[in-house]
Amino acid sequence: MHKGLLVAVVLALSLPAIAQDRGGGAGAQGRGAGPAGGRGAPPRPAAGNGIEVGGWFGRLDDPKESRTGLKFVTMGTGLHATTGPNMILFDADEDWEGPYTTKAAFTMTKLASHEVAYGLFVGGQDLDNDKQRYTYFVIRQDGKFLIRKRTGATVANVAGDWTDHAAIQKPNAQGSQTNELAIQVGRDTVTFLANGQTVATQPAKAVDVVGISGLRIGHGLDLQIEGFSVTQAK
């Protein structure tokens, strides 16, 4: 990623990137130069726009959408996201290549009005411009998952449509749903896990694996996120 471009985007608000001052807030663990070569994150301007976690950016799927209701904050031992529009959230320092694992535990605190997805993304490149690309692994409250690639404004399913899997916990009687998701990037294979169980595997060449890792969150959700981390595989 070109750091200068990302700064320009935030300052000019000419693309759908929004950010908050870095300021030492909580968030990704193991922050610093990822194995992708120490590109690091650019300095953040002290803007609000609902992103209140130090060092994190947000990018809306549609820059014309209203940010009304968007809030991303630290809460307890983790992060809390209330949306708002469909978007990704990320710390640009989490820029990785080579074997690594991205994971987080998500609790949807109340039922969504319809089936809305949330989860993780990896391989983020050019997130500051209209050539953005990344691969995301998301679930819904109906217990289904999807793996999809975004290239610019185009999205394509990696392996079929929404699929049921018994490993994905559905909401309880109170409407809360908790699942730990992980993406394990190996040298040749990428494994997608829910609550420690493999739900899918793909050849590494079929998905985006080099770049920024972060969160993918659909519209109108209220999520508590615990233990977001990216770690080098041994």
Question: Model segments located where?
Answer:
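Short, aromatic/His-centered strand-loop micro-motif at the edge of beta-sheets
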Residues: 154-180
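Short tryptophan-centered beta-strand motifs in secreted/extracellular beta-sheet-rich domains
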Residues: 102-104, 170-192
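Short carbohydrate-recognition loop motifs
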Residues: 68-88
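Beta-strand-rich interaction surfaces with strong enrichment in secreted/lumenal proteins
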Residues: 87-94, 165-173, 213-215
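Flexible glycan-contacting loops in extracellular carbohydrate-active proteins
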Residues: 202-227
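Secretory/extracellular carbohydrate-interaction modules
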Residues: 83-155
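Bacterial N-terminal signal peptides
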Residues: 7-16
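Disordered, low-complexity segments in secreted/periplasmic proteins that are enriched in proline
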Residues: 19-49
